[in-house]
Amino acid sequence: QNARRGPWHLAGIEINLRMGGTTHPFLALRFLTGGQLDPTSGLFKSQGGRLKYYRATDNLRSPRYRGLLPEDLFDLVTVNKLLYSERTECGVLFHMIGALSEFGKLGVTAIGNSVEEADRLYDRVLEVLEIETGYGRADD
């Protein structure tokens, strides 16, 4: 009981405390690897038992990305060997690519066998996009 106002009044609220952002990256990881969270350790293991880590965003954007077509994006990441591989269970997955050409925005999930590998893949995507979309443009 609340001494100042009488009986407590309960009200339901939602608090969204996901550290990883949206659920899309986790669902993609689960779908691609066939894995699940280990209830004892809290770590994600692929169906083959490998620990998996990811780094993701649903808000990667730059005015420089405008005009970049989805097929251009896939050419860039294929040439740079960044696409997800079933064999290694590592690589990069893109989503929201429909917003790429018009709005310069997309989502990316980088999956690795370590935190460092996931970070390296994610950073490499940023580097490739920066280099490839910067040709012929004056610095602002």
What name fits each language-model region?
Residues Q1-D140:
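ATP-dependent carboxylate activation and anion-phosphoryl transfer catalytic cores
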